[in-house]
Amino acid sequence: MSTSTSTTHGTGTDAAAEFAGKTAFVTGAASGIGLEIARRLAAGGAAVVVADYNEQGAQDVARSLTESGARAAAVRVDVTDPESVRRAVEFTAETFGGLQLAVNNAGIAGTSAPTGAYTVEDWQRVIDTNLNGVFYSLRHELPHLLAAGGGAVVNMSSILGTNGFAGSAAYSAAKHAVVGLTKTAAVEYAARGIRVNAVAPGFIDTPLLKGDEAQHRQLVALHPQGRLGTAEEVAELTLFLLSDRASFVNGSYHLVDGGYAAR
């Protein structure tokens, strides 16, 4: 496993106090929603491990965070490989002396095809990343959260975690399952000081949705607010759920969808 580590102390501003003294592990943090979450956690005083399959991207983000005065490290992780996940989580705890916060965000969109034509290979690839990756992450994060005396986890689901969408059999199935996994883990660990919640973005303007202007217009039309969401808006809710401000919020599923699910 290749890693990149660099640390400096934060600036000590009021905003930096919320997560001071805590370590956060964020998957899929080299771009999009994960990148924005990592940035905001670092700005809030957390030591952040930027975990991503894109090793160079993770290193670039970690370097940017440390240059801004944060404590950060990068690690390559393949969330479809339980051993890779174990090593990445262990690296996090060893580098910063523990783990209190986790965001299981890594995911892929997969191919678009009707259920009857969806290939087994494409199905398995999406399930391995979007569902099994969350399970493997939780499985290795939870012992460290227990050792730390508690903590908070956010799993990234989707509006398709409670809705269907033509052509998205594997993606929707995985995101539905993430909600069930979130609720189960929350019930199991609530009495031991660990909160587990899920965030459900609508269609967000990230690199995953770039390149097809016609599709972009169609997706915008599905949201009553008349636009796609932003990574910043998803990160804002995620940080609230990780914070002590959400101390009695547990086992729940939180939409960030511009009214999509209310139609």
What spans do the regions from the language model cover?
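Active-site helix of classical SDR
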Residues: 138, 174, 182
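C-terminal substrate-recognition "lid" of short-chain dehydrogenase/reductases
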Residues: 96, 138, 227-256, 260-262
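Residue(s) in the substrate-gating loop at a strand-loop-helix junction
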Residues: 158
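Short, small/polar-rich loop/turn modules that mediate ligand/substrate recognition or access, typified
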Residues: 97, 150, 190, 195, ...
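Short C-terminal tail/terminal secondary-structure segment
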Residues: 2-15, 109-112, 163, 222, ...
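Alpha-helical segment proximal to the catalytic Tyr-Lys
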Residues: 143, 187-191, 247
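Substrate-binding pocket helix/loop in short-chain dehydrogenase/reductase
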Residues: 113-115, 119-127, 219
